[in-house]
């Protein structure tokens, strides 16, 4: 078969198109585990156990594989030929991730023992300056498994009602009741585990009282309310199933927060706002407002009193949620990494993007995760490598939006030493061997001239580990020129110190010597979820949506030290 590409107006370039065929190693494996060019069910079972590492498999498991292959027209009653074996290896039921979306981790520990799928400014459709506010991003986030939704609450133009908007910008406004309604309707569509509604509160006490009634009426029995402000331990995700938790600053901390934010506001204007707010507090029945609003709050957000020096001291009698910017986190990670880990063993730590990310870009989530930060807040409307890592992390544990932190972040050493993710002395625990054989499906999911106008694509792949600094590494294959079905046949090794905090990131691009290389697919997933063996790795687009046909054939081997 040939493909023709026009060059200018009169010339035509012809390229021979190869079909997808098994690499030599796959052919050899088939011959090793088959007889007379057919692989029987018993021989397939031996392959599945010995090569794929599926020790739980039995003959019925293999018969199910054979049954599925009937739909590909490559099945024979006496077994499968090489083509059928290759189709099995590239099939959806040979994924590197678990085939069923089941929650398998212990969900009975405190909330602080889990990473939570967390959104930032969840109502924005685009940039942070002048995009629209809408309920649609909230719906999409919840249906994608996000468990922490953030709403910024401000007085409307009349000052008589609360509305959702990004204050100090030209973004549009959204009705608070609409936002609450879609949270209620979509909170538990894909996961029964609790949704945390983070309210960034810029309201007067009068409006706080109105919001308290609105929230209580909307969520009713789904609203989890904890009257004990001095709880020493957060409840577990299991005990909070189908519950909505409110996290915000208690009313008494509202004025303190406004004062601390004064660096970007004119002093006289800020002083007048504080004075007006103080008068309202005095004029209203402060106690009743505080009680109504406090009763909503089940995760109390504490102030960062004392700056960098004292913010991680914690309180042995009370757990809180502390928020800090990515910049503050980076500073603390360099100087007080173990203190961050210790703080997050009991308390919740929320990280948010720096204020200069006007384009709604994101930051490296691993900096927060390797230090135990549970709520690494992301702009879900922005695409790129860091969002792929976020999406990859929360493929774990059945995609329920909660991933249990590894023991290294929760337990101290025999002499009380706390894990330091940036240590240069971490021992190697295991070696990951990743072999990338080939890829297929681009010719079915993309137009003929999508990558190159005058020739088939020149694909190469990048394979990397994102984790603690010593584990982070990336490699790339050679470029396979003019091929819709690239064959790389390349193996990479990754010595890993903390594999339980590692993400495997894979990207494919089309090389172009004159312009920027074209994106051709990506995927990312936790190493803790990977099934060893030869697997079909499906790729996703920039937004994280899976392609229908594009996939890679890869092999994963973990060798403990």
Curated annotation (Swiss-Prot):
What's the Enzyme Commission number for this chain? 3.1.4.11
Region called Disordered, residue ranges:
256-285
- Induction or repression: By abscisic acid, osmotic stress and environmental stresses such as dehydration, salinity and low temperature.
| UniProt binding sites for Ca(2+) 1 | 452, 458, 510, 512
Any idea which GO molecular function terms this record carries?
Answer: metal ion binding; phosphatidylinositol-4,5-bisphosphate phospholipase C activity; phospholipase C activity
Q: Where is the composition biased (Basic and acidic residues)?
A: 267-276
Q: State the InterPro entries in the record.
A: C2_dom, C2_domain_sf, EF-hand-dom_pair, EF_Hand_1_Ca_BS, PI-PLC_fam, PLC-like_Pdiesterase_TIM-brl, PLC_EF-hand-like, PLipase_C_PInositol-sp_X_dom
Quote the catalytic activity from the record: a 1,2-diacyl-sn-glycero-3-phospho-(1D-myo-inositol-4,5-bisphosphate) + H2O = 1D-myo-inositol 1,4,5-trisphosphate + a 1,2-diacyl-sn-glycerol + H(+)
Q: Which keywords does UniProt give here?
A: Calcium, Cell membrane, Hydrolase, Lipid degradation, Lipid metabolism, Membrane, Metal-binding, Transducer
* Occurrences of domain PI-PLC X-box (ranges): 105-249
Q: What region holds the EF-hand domain?
A: 21-54
Protein topology in the membrane:
Peripheral membrane protein
Q: Where does Ca(2+) 2 bind?
A: 452, 510, 512, 518
Q: Taking every annotated instance into account, which residue ranges of this chain make up the domain C2? A: 414-541
Q: What are the Polar residues biased-composition ranges?
A: 256-266
What cofactor does this chain's UniProt record say it requires? Ca(2+)
Write out the tissue specificity statement of the associated record. Expressed in stems, leaves, roots, flowers and siliques. Predominant in the vascular tissues of roots and leaves.
**Which SMART domains does the UniProt record give?**
C2, PLCXc, PLCYc
**UniProt subcellular location:** Cell membrane
Entry GO CC:
plasma membrane
The UniProt record lists the keyword NAD: no
CDD domains associated with the record: C2_PLC_like
According to its UniProt entry, what is the function of this protein? The production of the second messenger molecules diacylglycerol (DAG) and inositol 1,4,5-trisphosphate (IP3) is mediated by activated phosphatidylinositol-specific phospholipase C enzymes. Required for secondary responses to abscisic acid signals.
Q: What is this protein called?
A: Phosphoinositide phospholipase C 1
